[in-house]
Amino acid sequence: YADWMQHHDFTMNHDVMQHHILPMLKQGERVFLVVFDNFRYDQWKAIETELTDYDITEQLCCSILPTATQYARNALFAGMMPSEIKQRYPDWWTEEDAEESKNLNEPHLIQAFLDRVRRRDTFSYHKINATDEAEQLLAEADELLQRNSLNVVVVNFIDMLSHARTESKMVRELAHDEAAYRSLTLSWFRHSAIS
């Protein structure tokens, strides 16, 4: 795995900011980076047809291991591997067995990335856990685009659904197999504020 990581020629979590977001910022584009936490490729394919009004270029990204949020999402925003984050920013790293949230420093990691690549772009960071938060964000979207070069949005519903699938008998019944899980994802997306 270590050798494979050293010589990969495809995009991984920690490459996204450098290879995809940074070039857009350098071209003066205003960027909304929307991250669906715990979102699988088959779920993406299920909702993709709902987005035909948009010009979408699909570029696959391979996740680092482990894929747990604290590693994968922090790597995405920092533009570096978790071991590098822990070494460079020990105050922002939370050990796996710690009780507190492992993603409290995502805005700091985004700012640190921008500082490392010598960008003075303004950015905003939003974590969406409920419909009213999504509606509020949408109401402010035009203003955010005017004010910031980069707007980062983390949508947590899929992650909450995934956890509920293992913890709740009712959700297990609704998403009893992979096809049902994709269907539930699609239904949520169609009726969500972000669709």
Put a short name on every predicted segment.
Residues 1-195:
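Feature captures the catalytic ectodomains and active-site-proximal regions of enzymes
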